[in-house]
Amino acid sequence: MTMGDMKTPDFDDLLAAFDIPDMVDPKAAIESGHDDHESHIKQNAHVDDDSHTPSSSDVGVSVIVKNVRNIDSSEGVEKDGHNPTGNGLHNGFLTASSLDSYGKDGAKSLKGDTPASEVTLKDPAFSQFSPISSAEEFEDDEKIEVDDPPDKEEARAGFRSNVLTGSAPQQDFDKLKALGGENSSKTGVSTSGHTDKNKVKREAESNSITLSVYEPFKVRKAEDKLKENSEKMLESRVLDGKPSSEKSDSGIAAAASSKTKPSSKLSSCIAAIAALSAKKAASDSCKEPVANSREASPLPKEVNDSPKAADKSPESQNLIDGTKKASLKPSDSPRSVSSENSSKGSPSSPVGSTPAIPKVRIKTIKTSSGEIKRTVTRVLPEVDLDSGKKPSEQAASVMASVTSLLSSSASATVLSSPPRAPLQTAMVTSAVSSAELTPKQVTIKPVATAFLPVSAVKTAGSQVINLKLANNTTVKATVISAASVQSASSAIIKAANAIQQQTVVVPASSLANAKLVPKTVHLANLNLLPQGAQATSELRQVLTKPQQQIKQAIINAAASQPPKKVSRVQVVSSLQSSVVEAFNKVLSSVNPVPVYTPNLSPPANAGITLPMRGYKCLECGDAFALEKSLSQHYDRRSVRIEVTCNHCTKNLVFYNKCSLLSHARGHKEKGVVMQCSHLILKPVPADQMIVPPSSNTAASTLQSSVGAATHTVPKVQPGIAGAVISAPASTPMSPAMPLDEDPSKLCRHSLKCLECNEVFQDEPSLATHFQHAADTSGQQMKKHPCRQCDKSFSSSHSLCRHNRIKHKGIRKVYACSHCPDSRRTFTKRLMLERHIQLMHGIKDPDVKELSDDAGDVTNDEEEEAEIKEDAKVPSPKRKLEEPVLEFRPPRGAITQPLKKLKINVFKVHKCAVCGFTTENLLQFHEHIPQHRSDGSSHQCRECGLCYTSHGSLARHLFIVHKLKEPQPVSKQNGAGEDSQQENKPSPEDEAAEGAASDRKCKVCAKTFETEAALNTHMRTHGMAFIKSKRMSSAEK
């Protein structure tokens, strides 16, 4: 039955709806936890708009009772004494929204608009928050709470009455009536004698002691305003015929909360409590009229108006359904609704000061006369029929090992906070009130959070403290400073803000076993949803197994959590934090030694050239005059730094800070910031800090680990005892002296270098010059050295190019004595020999006689080597000149067009049309005319092909036959008298043409003014003509 379906239920239905349920289905609670929490946020926001009171996001007071049922709300909550408000409040903190709802309902009841049942339906839904566990302060899945043992309910009940209303709740009031028999005739309630006056007295003492906690926090000004408001509200309610101490007190709380701001929530709550305690006597006097007026209140009006409240608080229906279901089996479980559902929203709860809900059974009977009789029966702890476990086994599932979180500011606040005594008093009060109860009823929620006295924490570092629970059980808790929580989420940071209220948060895993502090902590159970029976049994096993098994059970319990509800917050342990701090200290530490600046002005006679600022270390700023000193600087051993570079994916070992930073600089130059892990710092023994140099010679010290990489091949001179090590040009070196034991063997008459004519001042300088020069010029000699400089090349073509570019073509030239043009020269003797063989028909020319010996700087051996080289690898120019052989034998296969004009008598002419071949040119010219279809067509005299235009024929001759211009063609019979002379170039014609022939197009016979215009014109004929032009120009 939903709230929308409620028509006019009987009064018994409403009373039964608010019976205390024994158990809430954990699955249902898990499914609806998120939505319920969102609906709470919306309700809180609605209350804020009406009453201008901040929602429950602010940090509440440090000690407020947990699981307070809405005993101080108006008559609907107390109708049957069974409050589902265990659901309503979490960890003993009454939410601001709940107080606001009191204020709203109180105001409405003054006006007579809203019946008391509206408060009955609204308060359970609104009371599911605590001032500390607001939706804004913590995220939905990151809550911490402790379900306190049910043994402390007696003290909690009395404490609730003072904190919230200043008067005893109706349920306790019924107990008092049953014990004292004072008001039983007025209320008509039959009582059961399961409590005695000692318990009542103890409750009263607990109330008074607990209220004394807040004495130092009283605010006088707020107290006076609260007193005035309470008096006005009491008077108005008495006039309306509804005098209710619960209404007046809730109105006072609402008035207090409506006048406060988020920053003053704590002080306003304390002031409200103080004012309510001052009104205790007036509230007690109003109890009996409240009960009588509630019984006499008309039912239909309450029921008709109640759906309005139900619309505002959809959570109430879930509570009613759960309570009705639980009322069918009132003796099943001593657990209350809040013990399961309170895990939804509360991040913290006081262990030492807040007892649990009493296990009672209230039986409501409506007599025929219309009177209501209720019987309150104390239910002893029994085995839970739903889960089959005792209350001590009802602990929720284990969270993954959660260490205590303390922010640094919170630690300072804890150390300097004055109210130590009130917190200790609160803990003592809880312990005394539950002294007679069995310690088996202690239940621990998934993430237990205890509010410890300030004296429990003395330092901000990691330590183990003893925590005494309310059942006289002492456990060890590990407190770790906030330095290890640098990567925590915003929820953890907000939790640390809540800690600043003079409390210390200790998770339940630390309570279970203080030695389990893993490196990486996954706060898997911060969702605080009711857990299943499997996880509950695992916690029970954890508490009884050895430490090794505890760790495994914790991992299994964490794995059983719903994956979508797990908050993946990784907390860096203190060990990792110390490593990171050490690494940062190494990288950011200031060098205590001042920056070293060398003397960069050597004597003038030393002949040493130094950089402007020396060889400077980019990491520490030290500068050195010698590059060897800089290499030794990077090789020094001061500390062993072993680190894993994530970019290089390898373990690296550095022996000083500069080498590590230099490696990081290499990554930075590539645009990547160096990331490293597994840092290990080890001191270097004093005997290993200085690496002894080698015992060879003074110069051999240059063979250091860094400098050796740039050194060339060592050269050993046979007459010297030690090896002379050639160093880089930038590194000054001392020569190996003396050069010879006997000075008479030294063929030196002055301090002048015979190679470069440089004069030196002393023998060491000259020796250094020679050794240094040998180092620079001691490169590997290639096959073709240049005689003009110290370079060498692997091929003769590279050498020729080098001579042509660097030495302006200074080279021995060969001129042909048979050619009339003296400008025809050759750069190689082989080319001259081939020229004479091809052009002049001399088989064995004497090149030595023909060569120009003027300025000859080469020898015959080089020329012979070049001839052999050229014979193996012919040059591109030689390839073009080879087909011009005059006495070359004819080709065996004449199946392709002739690519070059062959000037020989053995030429075979082939008809391209029919394939006729002959060596007689006249016979060939007599054959080809028969293939000419038209007398006006242009026929090629070389192959017999016909073309329609002279340009096409000229193009064919130029490309295929390499002829510069077409031959005269006979139109009649194709045979001319001078047909044999056409293939021979005329020397007279070539001379006549002169310079104009160079600018004439060989394809279309056009003449151009410049060579550039001709080259541009050749592009119109295509690449084939351009290549032909280049080849023809190369032949010259």
Swiss-Prot record:
Molecular function (Gene Ontology), one example: zinc ion binding
A cellular-component GO term for this protein: nucleus
UniProt feature, compositional bias: Low complexity: 253-265, 336-353
Residues bearing the modification Phosphoserine: S130, S133, S134, S306, S313, S433, S875
InterPro entries: Zn532-like (IPR045914), Znf-C2H2_11 (IPR041697), Znf_C2H2_sf (IPR036236), Znf_C2H2_type (IPR013087)
Superkingdom, natural source: Eukaryota
Bias (Acidic residues) ranges: 136-151, 852-867
SMART domains for this protein: ZnF_C2H2 (SM00355)
Chain positions covered by the region annotation Disordered: 26-92, 106-206, 220-265, 281-362, 847-877, 966-1000
Modified residues (N6-acetyllysine): K175
Pfam entry (one): zf-C2H2_6
UniProt KW keywords: Acetylation, DNA-binding, Isopeptide bond, Metal-binding, Nucleus, Phosphoprotein, Repeat, Transcription, Transcription regulation, Ubl conjugation, Zinc, Zinc-finger
Feature: compositional bias, Basic and acidic residues: 32-52, 194-205, 220-249, 302-314, 868-877
Zinc finger (C2H2-type): 615-634, 751-775, 784-807, 814-840, 938-961, 999-1021
Crosslink feature (Glycyl lysine isopeptide (Lys-Gly) (interchain with G-Cter in SUMO2)) location: K458, K515, K879, K902
Stretches with biased composition (Polar residues): 182-193
Described purpose of this protein according to its UniProt entry: May be involved in transcriptional regulation.
Protein family per UniProt: Belongs to the krueppel C2H2-type zinc-finger protein family.
Identification of the protein by name: Zinc finger protein 532
UniProt lineage: Eukaryota, Metazoa, Chordata, Craniata, Vertebrata
